[in-house]
A protein has these predicted regions:
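Beta-rich ligand-recognition domains in immune and ubiquitin systems
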Residues: 1-222
């Protein structure tokens, strides 16, 4: 993934709320179509306490931008990313499934991180997908790259402005999709990659944002 200054397994000072989703039913068929995925849609908002200082949040916590190197006048906090230009959402997944979609423009990585994934320089790599507690996907100029634990896999597809993410925290499943226009104005999904992991803690949607770029969390009716 785009290189960032390292991250630690820091412990969060406050308990987080799990995102609202349908009651968890184990052993169901894994959703694969967009119609199946949106049954697990969760509403998300960005957590300004985690946002690295070059990131600016707007649209009621739905949009994160980095349009210059201007630093946002915010206080230092234990949960704030120190160097990696990232932000997490307030809502996390624990004991449930969730699906969300993001509009993106520019040099971004969209993914998820476990609650204890590091955020400070002393912690080692903390960019999404740079460590064993986070996963990410991003456009690499000619194809998509998915990252985990510092390793990347290529996926050949044209650039798509909407990314979909599905996570089943108890089952340890994280899937990335391209959300494309289908017939009759409907939307369809194309699987980019499916990760399996042993997820023992809360999983938070997250965003890495490069220069002149933004991510905007979509609403279900968009």
């Amino acid at each position: 993934m785009p290189s960032s200054t390292p991250s630690t397994n820091g412990i969060m000072p406050e308990a987080k709320k799990a995102a609202k989703a349908p009651p968890y039913e184990p052993n169901i068929t894994e959703p694969n179509t967009r119609a199946e995925l949106i049954k697990y849609w969760i509403n998300l908002s960005l957590d300004d306490r985690t946002a690295q200082k070059m990131l600016w949040l707007s649209e009621g916590g739905a949009k994160v931008s980095r349009m210059s190197e201007e630093v946002c006048p915010v206080l230092d906090r234990p949960e704030r990313y120190e160097h990696s230009p990232q932000v997490l959402c307030k809502q996390g997944l624990l004991g449930n499934r969730g699906y969300w979609e993001v509009d993106c423009e520019g040099w971004v990585v969209i993914g998820a991180a476990c609650e204890s994934a590091g955020r400070k320089a002393k912690d080692g790599p903390c960019g999404l997908g740079e460590n064993d507690l986070s996963w990410g996907v991003g456009w690499a100029g000619c194809c998509y790259h998915v990252w985990h634990n510092g390793e990347n896999t290529e996926f050949q597809a044209p650039l798509c402005p909407i990314i979909g993410i599905y996570a089943d925290q108890p089952a340890g499943i994280i899937k990335f999709y391209l959300v494309e226009e289908g017939e009759n104005g409907s939307k369809e999904v194309k699987l980019v990659h499916r990760f399996t992991a042993n997820l023992k803690e809360m999983l938070f949607p997250g965003f890495w944002v490069g220069r002149n770029s933004y991510c905007w969390i979509r609403k279900m009716d968009q």
